[in-house]
Structure formats: C-alpha cells, structure tokens
C-alpha cells in the first residue's frame, strides 16, 4: 500500500469504531478511536470540549488528525463523524492513507444509537437527518472507498478487510 493509515469516516453511529476495531484484529493492525485520542491529548471529554464550543473540539480533532495521519505502523482509525468538516483533516490522511466511508442509512443508525450520549445528536433524530444531509456529499467526495453497512456487521468488517488487503 505504501500508506500506513486507514481512516474510517461516516455518520455518528454508522459503525466506524466497531468495524475498525474488528478489522484491525483480523489484519494485525493497530487501532485508534479518534474521539478517545482527542480526550487523551486534551485531558477532557468530548462532551466537555463541545460545551466550550464545537470549534474548540474541532481544533483538538485537527491536531489528532495531524498526529494520527503520520503514524508509521499499519493502523486503522475511526474518526468522529464531523472530521470531514475541515478539508485539512482529510488532506492529512490522503497523503499517508486511504479513506473508507462507512455508509449506513439513518434509519439503521436510529435503531442502535443512544442519541443522548452523542453531543451533536442530543437534539434528537431530526438533528441526525440534518447532519446526514449536510455531510453525505462530503463523505462521498473525500472517500477512496465506500462500504454499505446495512447488512450484517460481519459483512461490513469483511468488506473493509478486503479493501485494505487490496491496497497493501
């Protein structure tokens, strides 16, 4: 592949973290959840950062992108859903990695996600639909590959693994 980093992008609740973790186990790659990484470097929770402002959180997220995109070991990273809001974040990963869009229909996300636990979704399902409408085109523009996650979890994991193997 010549590129060490695989970035998973998509809506909150689309399965990025679960798919990324399981795919990394199958491939022997390292795994990072970008939101957890942001919490480590900021010594704050995502919720606390958002309570200051979304831009404040996004600044830490951009720092995380710069650091994680330059990793030398084979790594899968699950991003936050809004990582695509700053093109510079995506540009970091285009240089040293591939970007896979985990595309899951909103109706499927709503079946599984606790909206109260997600800072940007606390206003309910209408907010999720609005985010989807705002971001969907960007996910498609920025991704190198797309995996539809509306079948079984194992199907989505296997698709991600297959894409990564093809790029090695």
Segments predicted by a language model, with ranges:
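Nucleotide and nucleotide-moiety/phosphate-recognizing core
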Residues: 3, 19, 26-31, 64-79, ...
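Hydrophobic anchor at the beta1->P-loop junction of P-loop NTPases
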Residues: 8
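A glycine- and Lys/Arg-enriched "phosphate-lid" helix/loop adjacent to the NTP-binding pocket
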Residues: 96-137
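Short glycine/serine/threonine/alanine-rich loop segments
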Residues: 29, 44, 144
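NTP-dependent small-molecule kinase module
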Residues: 2-3, 18, 22, 26, ...
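ATP-dependent small-molecule kinase phosphotransfer cores
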Residues: 36-91, 133
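Conserved glycine(s) of the Walker
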Residues: 15
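P-loop (Walker A) phosphate-binding loop of NTP-binding proteins
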Residues: 11
């Amino acid at each position: 592949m010549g590129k060490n980093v695989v970035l998973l992008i998509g809506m909150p609740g689309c399965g990025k973290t679960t798919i990324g973790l399981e795919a990394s186990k199958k491939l022997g790659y390292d795994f990072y959840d970008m939101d957890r990484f942001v919490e480590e470097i900021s010594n704050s929770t995502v919720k606390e950062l958002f309570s200051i402002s979304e831009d404040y959180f996004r600044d830490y997220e951009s720092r995380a992108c710069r650091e994680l995109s330059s990793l030398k070991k084979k790594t899968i990273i699950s991003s936050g859903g809004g990582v695509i809001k700053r093109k510079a974040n995506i540009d970091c990963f285009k240089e040293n990695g591939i970007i896979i869009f985990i595309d899951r229909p909103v109706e499927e996300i709503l079946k599984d996600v606790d909206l109260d636990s997600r800072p940007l979704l606390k206003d309910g399902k209408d907010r999720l639909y609005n985010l989807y409408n705002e971001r969907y085109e960007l996910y498609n523009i920025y991704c190198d590959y797309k995996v539809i996650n509306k079948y079984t979890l194992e199907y989505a994991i296997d698709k991600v693994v297959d894409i990564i193997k093809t790029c090695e």
